[in-house]
Every structure is written in C-alpha cells, then in structure tokens.
C-alpha cells in the first residue's frame, strides 16, 4: 500500500492513542528511509572492485591497477576492450573460451578501477549484447563470473546506464538458481541488487521476472558472503513504496526462520543486511510483522542493541524496533516488565544509544522511545521510573534541533494518557510536575519559536498541558517566567490557522485582562 503523502510521519503526539496512525506512519517511513539510507551509508548501489570468488591474487592485482587516469584515456580503453570482446565472442577456434575470459577480465578491470568507470563508453561500443551472450547457459563459470561482474559495475552507474541491463535481467535471475556455483550466483545477485536500487520501475521488472524467490533462497544457508550480498539485494528489492514484494517474500517457506537465525547468530556485517530486510518487512507487511513478533524478534533486536557498537547495524535495528513498537505495544510492555531497570532492558539499550556521539543514533533511539511513550499508562510509567529521564531532559536543552524535537515527543507523551478523537487528553500530573521541575519548559518554548511547524505545534501543546495541569494554578507563572507569552504572541497573525488559533486561545484564556489581578 503506497503512502498517499497525507499521513503523519509519526503518530500525532499527545493527542492520539497508540497505534492510531501506526500503519500509515510505518509505510511512509519505508518510502523515505531509502533516501536516508543512501545518504548515511551509501548502500543503494555498490561498485564491485573485488570479486565474489575469493581470488586474493586477483584482488591484489586489481589494487595495483587502480591508478588515476584521464577520463578520455579510460573511455578509449573501454571502447577498445569491447571491440576485443566482440572479436573474442565471434572467434570459434582453439582457445576460444580463454580468449573470451581474457577479454571479459580486461573490460571488468576497466569498469572497476576508477572512481568514475567508463560505463557510457562501454555501452556506446555495444557491451550489453556481448555480455548477455557470455551469460548463456553452458558457459564456463569463469566466463559467467566475469560477465556478471561487468554487468554489476554497469548497473552501479547512472540511471540510464542501469536501465541498459534490461536485456540481461532474465539470465542474471536464472543464474541465481542452485545449479550455479556460489561465486556466480552471488555476483548475479549483486548485479540485481544494483538494478533494484535504482528505483521502483526496475524493481517491478525484476519482480515480474521472478527475481524474488531465488534471491530469498540464497539466504537460507550459512554462507557469509553469499548471505550478505543476497540480503542486501533483497532489501533493495522489497523496499517499497508498494508492499507487494514484502508480501510475496513472507510467503516463501522458511524465509522468516532464516531471517531470525541470521539476526541471532551471524556476524555484524551480515546482521546489518538482514536488519534492513526487517526494516522494510515491518514497515510494509502486517503479516510479516505478526509472524516475526511471534518468532521473538523483539528480544533479538534488543540483544543486538545491547551488544553491538556498529552504527551501520544499530540504525536498522532501531528502525525495526520502532516499527514493531508501533504495531504491537503489548509485546513491548511484556519485555519492559520482565527486564525493567537493567542495562539489557529495552529502555537500557535505548539509553545507551542516546548517550552515543552519533547524531543519527540519538535521533533513532528517541524516535523509538516516543513510540513507546505514546502507549498505555503502563508504558509511560515504566519509562518515567528509569534512568533515561535525566538524560532526556539534558538532551532537550543541549542537542541539535532535530534530536530535541524527537525527545520532546517522548516527554510530551509521558505527560498524558492516550486520547481518542478531539477529546483533550487526561494529564498525568505526577509526570508533568516531575518533567517541568526538571527544567524542560524552556526547551518546549524554544520549539514554539522555531520555524518548524511540527515543532511549534508540539511546543504549544506542551504549554497547554502546563497551563492546564500544573497544581495550584502555577502554570501561567511558569510559562511567563520563560517568556512563553512572547513566544505564543508571534502566532497572533500567523498564516497557519491551526497554530494561530491554538496560540491566541491560550493567551486569551490564561493571560487575559484578569491575569495577575489577585497578586
């Protein structure tokens, strides 16, 4: 189900019940995460410089050959290399196979050795039909591997260069099968992963040609490199915005067991690739989400958070955890109760991430906590009773804006019970007093002053809680003491009607003509 763009990027803070817009939020997150993922980890496409056959000697030669050369020289060499490949393909005499492999290897080296490989020149010279011909069934493994490697690096190029692989896709998919050698299958999976990383249209072509089942079966064995490559390609193939591929993947017998096994037992690099599959499954497939929860996914994710320091792994693990929290808060509550107040508890591992120096990690951890804090009164009490509270209050006053905003969602949600519709939420006064006493009000008023509409709304909502909920009517004085009146008055003629009405109503109600008259 593609997001229509109208859904909130997270459940509406303070006013909504847990899960109210969780499904929409998870689907939208799956659409946007691909861009973030490329920016943070440069993962959508990968140039292959060292092959999948484990040939160390070849890798060393490759490294020696990686010298900076003028682009025109590289392009001329690429054109010449394609012509030599064309001659080798046509040659039928003695040593024909070795002649083809030598020509393929030379083209592959040219497509691997530069930061900007001469892909366009190779395509103009007619490389694709020749590479497709070299992928034909019955060809020696060495020829298949070199051809798939060339196609992998072509697919890592510009969009139009990636699309040039369309004629090769059926054979690349066919070589994913069990009859292929592991290096050949892995190299073909790599090429397919690059194609899938280009965009939705090419993903749909791959799905229609049957790429998903053989790719999924490649993660069943415990073969590290093959599993990593196949899992990365799978995550590119299912990442949305449509849920069709995720729904198809979860129907493959044994796939969820394999995902859980690898997340639990494999090295961090493999677990990272598996975790990105979980991100998209938990965002796009309710069936997969339910089945993974039954398989104990939450505890596995928490265990990875507790034991890993790898940013590349922790980001998808946190993203997955937040998705599961949004869809099944009861499962999270069970774990909260069982492991409360320990470093290995869900709150403990999220606190660990909040203490990290990595900005993205802090933001992701705060987002997960905001999902938990938007749950039941039990969820809120469990968070409020832990060591994470002083940490959240400190972050609200010291961190960059985007992290402060995420933390503000946590603190705001801790102060109210979940409410349905337009009804004002009931304030949890004990939490509100504690959080305000911790010095958070200034941080929320700073959000009101920000140009970010979402943050300003959140700040105004919290001010309303303070004005309405602090005991002995002390809310207005507290807000005034932090220059909250001035912050709200900036909305007197604001173009956003919702914020204008909200701010003006609060000023009129709590700071009208009679304000301060009894002092």
Curated annotation (Swiss-Prot):
A GO-annotated cellular component: nuclear envelope
Transport as UniProt keyword: yes
GO biological process, one term: protein import into nucleus
Pfam family, one: Arm
InterPro entries: ARM-like, ARM-type_fold, Armadillo, Importin_alpha
Superkingdom as given in the UniProt entry: Eukaryota
Alphabetized GO MF terms: nuclear import signal receptor activity
ARM repeats: 116-156, 158-197, 200-239, 244-283, 286-326, 335-374, 377-416, 429-468
Region (Disordered): 1-29
Role according to the record: Binds to conventional NLS motifs and mediates nuclear protein import across the nuclear envelope. Acts as a cellular receptor for the nuclear import of the virD2 protein of Agrobacterium, but is not essential for Agrobacterium-mediated root transformation.
Subunit comment: Forms a complex with importin subunit beta-1.
Protein's name in the database: Importin subunit alpha-9
Protein source organism: Arabidopsis thaliana (Mouse-ear cress)
């Amino acid at each position: 189900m593609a997001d229509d763009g109208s859904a909130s990027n997270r459940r509406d803070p303070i006013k909504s019940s847990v899960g109210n817009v969780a499904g929409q939020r998870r689907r939208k997150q799956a659409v946007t995460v691909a861009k973030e993922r490329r920016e943070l980890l440069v993962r959508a496409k990968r140039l292959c410089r060292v092959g999948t056959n484990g040939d160390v000697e070849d890798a060393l030669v490759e490294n020696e050959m990686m010298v900076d050369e003028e682009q025109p020289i590289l392009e001329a060499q690429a054109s010449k290399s394609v012509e030599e490949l064309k001659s080798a393909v046509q040659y039928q005499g003695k040593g024909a196979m070795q002649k083809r492999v030598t020509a393929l290897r030379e083209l592959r080296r040219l497509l691997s050795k530069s930061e900007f490989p001469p892909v366009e020149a190779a395509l103009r010279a007619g490389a694709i039909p020749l590479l497709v011909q070299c992928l034909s069934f019955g060809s020696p493994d060495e020829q298949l591997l070199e051809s798939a490697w060339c196609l992998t690096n072509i697919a890592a190029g510009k969009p139009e260069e990636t699309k040039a692989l369309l004629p090769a896709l059926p054979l690349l998919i066919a070589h994913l099968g069990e009859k292929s050698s592991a290096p050949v299958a892995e190299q073909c999976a790599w090429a397919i992963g690059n194609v899938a990383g280009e965009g939705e249209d090419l993903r749909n072509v791959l799905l229609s040609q049957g790429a998903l089942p053989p790719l999924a079966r490649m993660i069943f064995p415990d073969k590290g490199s093959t599993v990593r490559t196949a899992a990365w390609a799978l995550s590119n193939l299912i990442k949305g915005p449509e849920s069709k591929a995720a729904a198809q993947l979860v129907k493959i017998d044994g796939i969820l067991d394999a995902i859980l096994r690898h997340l639990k037992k494999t090295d961090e690099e493999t677990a990272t690739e598996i975790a990105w599959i979980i991100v998209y499954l938990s965002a796009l497939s309710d069936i997969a989400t339910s089945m993974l929860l039954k398989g104990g996914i939450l505890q596995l994710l928490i265990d990875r958070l507790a034991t890993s320091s790898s940013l590349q792994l922790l980001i998808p693990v946190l993203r997955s955890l937040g998705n599961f929290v949004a869809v099944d808060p009861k499962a999270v509550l069970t774990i909260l109760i069982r492991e409360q107040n320990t470093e290995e508890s869900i709150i403990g591992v999220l606190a660990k991430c909040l203490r990290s120096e990595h900005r993205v990690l802090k933001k992701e951890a705060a987002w997960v906590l905001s999902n938990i804090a938007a749950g039941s009164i039990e969820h809120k009490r469990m968070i409020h009773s832990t060591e994470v509270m002083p940490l959240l209050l400190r972050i609200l006053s010291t961190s960059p804006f985007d992290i402060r905003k995420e933390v503000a969602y946590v603190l705001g949600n801790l102060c109210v019970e979940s409410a349905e519709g337009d009804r004002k939420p009931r304030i949890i006064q004990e939490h509100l007093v504690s959080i305000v006493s911790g010095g958070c009000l200034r941080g929320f008023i700073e959000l009101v002053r920000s140009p970010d509409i979402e943050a300003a709304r959140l700040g105004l909502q919290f001010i309303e809680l303070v004005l309405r909920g602090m005991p002995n009517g002390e809310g207005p004085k507290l807000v005034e003491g932090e220059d909250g009146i001035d912050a709200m008055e900036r909305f007197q003629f604001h173009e956003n009607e919702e914020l204008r009405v909200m701010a003006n109503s609060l000023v009129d109600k709590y700071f009208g003509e009679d304000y301060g008259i009894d002092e």
